[in-house]
């Protein structure tokens, strides 16, 4: 059954890559060489995702590992949004809302697609920077002499993408809440203990000004449970 699901996943992925690549090829008002360069670079980015997973990144210099991680993982999301965008454009062409010329060797179409994709990812990045604070009031059946203040975090996914500079800001936000206790509900690690060690993430955790209680998440098991426990 697992093999069947793997085959279905790979066929779906290949179909999506083929659909997006074909549309990009048709859309670009470039020479054949130019089309090959652009579509080839896109496909190599997808391949990078799989080579990162198969061969790993921990044996590479940190800057190289970060670059390969960002390239491979970003390509999935860019490809997914391109897939949805081209599906909408194809639907618009079928109902005669979008002229066929918009999708074939078109500077107008190319600039429009680039503008839409840039706008989507800029908005997404700005939303990512805005960390949402959700206040929760928990009632106790037992009498408490005073109120207690806790902060809970989840899915930090620290590593090659969420790096030390970013985590430093999160620590500052947590300390600003002045909690008595900090809870972390798993997935501190994204997938590599080495990425945390090289960036001395432990030093940032030590800046937290309250006791920390954390549990393992699935990414801790993926990165290696014994190593994750030692880091904890």
Model-derived features: positions:
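Soluble catalytic domains of enzymes that build or remodel membrane lipids, polysaccharides, and related
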Residues: 134, 139-232
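Non-catalytic terminal accessory segments
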Residues: 1-129
């Amino acid at each position: 059954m697992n093999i069947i699901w793997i085959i279905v996943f790979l066929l779906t992925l290949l179909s999506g890559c083929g659909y997006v690549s074909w549309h990009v090829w048709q859309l670009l008002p470039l020479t054949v060489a130019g089309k090959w360069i652009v579509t080839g670079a896109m496909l190599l980015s997808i391949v990078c995702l799989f080579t990162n997973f198969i061969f790993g990144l921990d044996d590479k210099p940190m800057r190289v590992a970060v670059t390969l991680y960002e390239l491979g993982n970003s390509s999935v999301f860019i490809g997914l949004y391109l897939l949805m965008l081209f599906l909408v454009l194809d639907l618009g062409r079928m109902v005669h809302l979008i002229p066929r010329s918009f999708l074939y060797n078109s500077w107008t179409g190319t600039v429009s697609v680039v503008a839409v994709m840039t706008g989507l990812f800029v908005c997404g990045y700005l939303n990512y920077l805005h960390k949402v604070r959700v206040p929760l009031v928990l009632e106790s059946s037992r009498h408490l002499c005073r109120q207690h203040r806790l902060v809970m975090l989840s899915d930090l996914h620290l590593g090659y993408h969420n790096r030390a500079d970013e985590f430093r800001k999160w620590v500052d936000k947590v300390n600003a809440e002045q909690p008595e206790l900090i809870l972390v509900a798993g997935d501190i690690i994204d997938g590599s203990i080495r990425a945390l060690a090289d960036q001395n993430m432990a030093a940032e955790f030590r800046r937290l000004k309250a006791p920390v209680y954390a549990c393992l998440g699935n990414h801790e098991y993926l990165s290696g449970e014994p190593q994750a426990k030692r880091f904890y």
